[in-house]
Amino acid sequence: MLPFSRIAIIGLGLIGSSLAHAIRAYLPTARVTGHDADPDVRAIARRIDLCDDITDTAGAAVIDADLVVLCVPPGAMAAVAAAIAPDLAADVILSETASCQVSIIAAIRAVLPDVTLVPAHPVAGTENSGPESGFATLFQNRWCILTPPAGTEPLAVARVEDLWKKVGANVETMDAAHHDLVLAVTSHLPHIIAYTIVGTASDLENVTQGEVIKYSAGGFRDFTRIAASDPTMWRDVFLANKDAVLQMLQRFTEDLTQLQRAIRWDDGDALFEHFSKTRAIRRSIIEQGQDDAAPDFGRHRE
């Protein structure tokens, strides 16, 4: 398998900075060039020696790169793709890490119709953001889902798959539309629920914010961790994947109504059955190594 020799990462938040750390740790022969639209982020990236090179423009970052990875919010993907178009090498492989794929693939294809595109979404993260939040082991034993459009060159897909395996990820290939539906269930819906619960608690008129903070139980604290995620990225995710998110919200609303009815009518059997089923799912997640009781899924920063 021909390894990538020059990798450009556009967007140096949690995912982009972690990918830079991981490539430099596990693929030391590859040269990593990074860019971020925010000059303060670029300054931090230079200070912490995040990449071999940090450029002031996206176009400069991708010159001579054989792999370009877009790690920007979904709403910025099309503009960034257009900005780098004149400087891309003819044989470059373009990838992106968005958690919603159908609309992003279409947006990129609109400005780069002929580029070899291999999207790769790492299902990994923390509530932190920014270039100093990244660490090389973020992707260890996490899934990375590839969603190559139909007709993508198999060798290009294999090379991107190989890169993600080398930085520690488990790799799966999936249809983009199915990916978006799965992630609406496992990621997008939990985030919108967390934002809503924390927002409701902060808006209660007969309970002060001070009391909410002082007496927060473990479950509420878990929701606040999720609700601390990057608001720009999540705004873009919900808008970009709105059809799947709305579908899952409708299903969730129906299920919530059933629970409300069970509580109202003292139907303890229905509640117990539901809670037992969901408890089993939690145990399965831990058994498959997709969670850990320790912070950051038990991973240590490197």
Where are these regions (language model features)?
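Internal alpha-helical scaffold of NAD(P)-dependent oxidoreductase catalytic cores
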Residues: 138-225
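Short acidic-hydrophobic, aromatic-tinged amphipathic segments that line or gate anion-handling sites
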Residues: 53-57, 173
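Rossmann-like NAD(P)(H) cofactor-binding subdomain of soluble oxidoreductases
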Residues: 80-132
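NAD(P)+-binding Rossmann beta1-loop-alpha1 motif at the extreme N-terminus of oxidoreductases
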Residues: 1-54, 62-64
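Residues at the starts of beta-strands that form the adenosine-phosphate
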Residues: 6, 31, 116, 143, ...
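Rossmann-like NAD(P)-binding element
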Residues: 58-88, 92-95
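Interdomain hinge/lid region at the active-site interface
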Residues: 209-277
